[in-house]
């Protein structure tokens, strides 16, 4: 079994309307969403993002201008709002100091710098690089690991799982599914895992349909 085969299985199961998948791909909003989505559902993140938009503060300067209590209230739907307030403030202060603005951050940030920021783990780092900065970075989330484990793949680290997934044949898949870049492929691949997981995995329980599909595939 190869990463290519798994990609095609998921691609044929999920009707992915947009290869880039993440809402407002390539924008500053993705950075905020990647932090807010830690340990919560995306619909909760959308409520928080809407609060920030309605307040007119969905920017580095806007968020940094807020006191902690105000920001915590605005992002309350995402849960862990006091912790996430500190994480956002720390990250955006560092971005402002090191890069000045989002566009420079998008063009210049590297993985080592980003993952060294407090509260930014491997998954959040990959999500920001892939969906905000448009880099060739594959995101590995819990759904991905659960599916790979079901297929009897065990990985000792995030990087090891990421490397296996990145074994896709871009030339073949780009011709077959019209991917214009490796980033576009990685965006879609992660999106497929998430959408499949949302539909077929509850906790650690797979739907019978998913079990049959993956067992036959494996």
Stretches with model-predicted labels:
Residues 3-218:
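Catalytic cores of DNA base-excision repair glycosylases
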